[in-house]
Amino acid sequence: MNRILSKGPRGLNGLLRACPSNFGRSFLCRSTYNVNSRTFWSAPRLRSEDSPSSSQPLKPDPNDGNGNTHRTTSTASSQHTPWYLQEETPIDESRQISSRDQIPELPENSPAILPVLLDYVFKDLGLDELRLLDLRGLETPPPIGANAIMIIGTARSVKHLNVSADRLCRWLRSTYKLTPYADGLLGRNELKIKLRRKARRARVASRAGTTVDEKDDGITTGWICVNAGVVENSPVGEQASRKVEGFGNIVGGTRVVVQMFTEEKRAEVDLEGLWLATIERDRRRRQVSIDTKSDAPHEEVRASTPVQNSSSDHVFGLHSRSSAILPLEQRRGLHSKCRLLGPQTEDNQDDGLDDGLDMSPDSNSTGTDHLAANRTCDKEVATDSLLEHLSGLPDDEALSELGAGQEDTDSTPFLRRFYDALSQMSAEEAAVAQVKLLCTAISRHHLGYSKESLWKAFTTCNYHTYFISDELGIEIVSAMLTALPARQGGPKATGVLPEADRELALRVLEHLSLRGTDILNMKVFHLLYKAASHPTNLSGEEVVKDVTGTTKDRPTSRVAKLIETLDIQFDPEEARKLMMSMFRNEDYDGFWKLWSKLPLNGSPRTSADYEMLFRLHAELGDERRARDCVSTWAPIMSREHPPIPLRGQVVQHIMYCILIAEPAIDRMATAGSTSNLALIWNDCKNNAPARG
């Protein structure tokens, strides 16, 4: 046996063929071992076992007389390229992306951020079945805002939904400095905490042998709306009519909204189906309107009298002028302001109209009548002129012109002219003018005009979708936050602002915020700060002090912290007003913070700022603060850019502060004192204006 096996493969193969099989068949002829039956060669192997072409034997070259194949196989082996060096054939991107996972096409005039946003949502966030809806052409703006583009995508799970929305908000903030808002988004830790609590409740219930109530716990909402806001500020042409349906004002720019769903929630809501139906209805409505206008016959309008063109019309190609006779021989012309009509066109019931122009305080009724005498001007401009003139009058005269109250319409020349102009206005213009009158009267502390009537007029304008500008909206808030006058409720009621008035002001601010008005600015927060400084009742508010003697937990301090936390855009004019309010409210730290921010925000301190600084310290009368203020800031005046000269009213206020800090400063300076206050006192005396 050993001799047979030692003969190599030939002996083994013969043995296998000769062995009978117990199963009725012989063994396979091919051995299970990979035995190479070829003889040993010193040359390379003819065929590679790993090569795909090894199954076909190489044929000798017929031109070779000796039939030598060694040379041919050597050449083929040298030309063989291994698999790891072969270049892969590039696969078309359209084959890689299925039909349900493709980036939608961009609409016309799309913002520059849209293709980048779609690419990020598709590739980085991994949302599937993206759908883009262009809602900019809708006649009725959607609740999410006008000129909106909506992107709808599907997330793979609830966790993927929350993570994608969070990453998208962070990407928009960091890359494009936007302020997106994700409605329905749970924070990174909030979702983990809720899931952990839910699992804990399930374990406790299982131990007790009960089941957990499967009600909506707010975790698996399956829908997150990421509103990126206005991504491109493009001017929108002002429409002729402001009577539009929908929410908010007509704003410029395009806003982008990304709607993220889970697969089940998207099928349940079918948001794209709802919006596609709305877009189709709007398209049909527009088509019907176009067809109606095209089918309507064109009416030909001709003048009743012959038209005679002037020579200037032939030269410049202008439109022909009509020879219609204007009433009372009135002629139109181009003027910088409205032209006064003749005395024959005025109402003779007011005696003050024939007395000429006298804008002195003694003849304010004549000036009021003069401002309303321009009958050829637009009535809205006339009411604005009347209100502007009223705001320039002293308080006593303004209260006299406003009459007895809101029901009074003809007791004064101002009211007669104002309501006469209202009678010739449209309903929208009259309602807005009435709101302006109420704001002016309430700000002047007129007892006949209530804040409830102003709120009613404001809600009426909103109900009829009348246009109220942002400036008028802030003016309404300012009127709502006007404190009660000193004569109402006795001397102790000075500066009292009831809680009901604050609530009305906050409701107005909430409405302005919902329609898109920017209320996070220093002007609004200055109004809130002044309102917080007033007590809500006659007894006042108890001031809580800590062990150091400083006040804490005051409403004004909370508003100041809110201003600092929100990092509101710096407004130099409103910042100076807020500084004065903070100083008079004993918030000295807030005052100095804003004072130091003036030059850092591109608003250098001026002579008026230093005049305000020293005047406030002189009115305060605190010896220590007056000394520190003069010693620190009087020398810095010459170091400002540009330098502040030591002259004018600022010199008087500095001297008052020095007298508060050191009453005997004049004697000390005369005696030759070299103290800091004495040197500043001498400089002020040298630059003080001479008294005649």
Curated annotation (Swiss-Prot):
Acidic residues: compositionally biased ranges: 347-357
Residue ranges with Polar residues bias: 65-81
Domain of life the protein comes from: Eukaryota
GO biological process: mitochondrial gene expression; mRNA stabilization
Signal sequence interval, chain numbering: none
UniProt key word Transit peptide: yes
Keywords annotated in UniProt: Membrane, Mitochondrion, Mitochondrion inner membrane, Transit peptide
UniProt GO cellular component terms: mitochondrial inner membrane
Protein topology in the membrane: Peripheral membrane protein
InterPro entries tied to this protein: Atp25, NT_sf
Cellular localisation: Mitochondrion inner membrane
Basic and acidic residues: bias regions: 292-302
Transit peptide region: 1-73
Recorded family membership: Belongs to the ATP25 family.
Annotated function: Probable mitochondrial mRNA stabilization factor.
Protein name per the record: ATPase synthesis protein 25, mitochondrial
Species: Neosartorya fischeri (strain ATCC 1020 / DSM 3700 / CBS 544.65 / FGSC A1164 / JCM 1740 / NRRL 181 / WB 181)
